[in-house]
Amino acid sequence: MEIRRQGLIVWLHSLKQAKMLRKFGNVHYVSKRLKYVVVYCNMEDAERIIAKIRSYSFVKQVDLSYKPFLKMEFESKQDKAKEYDYKAGL
């Protein structure tokens, strides 16, 4: 059984409180220059965690990651070399 995970992007006013976000899930990345933190949590708990994180005064904004909703199976295109094969008519 695989647990579905959801990424949360938390924009902060100051990075001093970034450690405090560890209690909500796994802190995957902290950007010092852009002042945001990527936190992974269980998908069924995401709405409750977002509401709790937004209540803090040091949080500017909380965004959801769209990665779980993207189709990760890609179709291959034909090779351009095969498309312009000039020796086929000889």
Curated annotation (Swiss-Prot):
The keyword Cytoplasm applies. It is found in: Cytoplasm. The keyword Cytoplasm applies. GO terms for cellular component: cytoplasm. It holds the Pfam family DUF2129. Its main location: cytoplasm. InterPro entries: DUF2129. Keywords: Cytoplasm. Belongs to the UPF0298 family. This is UPF0298 protein BLi01717/BL02989. The lineage of its organism: Bacteria, Bacillati, Bacillota, Bacilli, Bacillales.
